[in-house]
Amino acid sequence: LPMTGAVIVSTPQKVALADARKGINMYQNEKVNVPILGLVENMAWFTPAELPQNKYYLFGKEGVKRLAEEMHVPLLGQIPIVQSICENGDNGTPEVLNDGSQTGQAFMAFARRVVEETGRRNAEQAPTKIVEVKK
């Protein structure tokens, strides 16, 4: 199947950023040549339920944002760590449906950015070729 583009997900830790960089380089390699729609930072910060305005950067601050700038790809979003993601997921309710929450809004903003970047990519670039893996 041809790929419209790749979304690279990383956490802000240095080792995760190194892996994300390798992924970007792989997709941008002329043999693969799949456009990068952008990066998303997972576990960007921790926000406790009782202090929803506080942000604790447990794994580093804005590492994916810096990588996006360095690699010249869009930053599609930053998703915090909050207990409700796990709880709602376990209950079968995606966090994105909780539009009153900061996290639900972050997921919606990320989804909108993916749609925007996909539309931009499709308007500006030819369809990708099917990536063939040869033995």
Which role fits each region the language model picked out?
Residues 19, 102, 106:
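Charged catalytic carboxylate motif
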Residues 3, 97-98, 135:
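Short, charged low-complexity intrinsically disordered segments located at boundaries
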Residues 109, 113, 124-135:
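A short, charged, Gly/Pro-tolerant segment at domain boundaries
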Residues 33, 116-124:
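Charged, solvent-exposed alpha-helical segments that act as regulatory interaction surfaces
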Residues 91-103:
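C-terminal boundary of histidine-terminating zinc-finger modules
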Residues 1-87:
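Conserved catalytic-core segment of NTP-binding enzymes
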Residues 105-119:
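Acyltransferase
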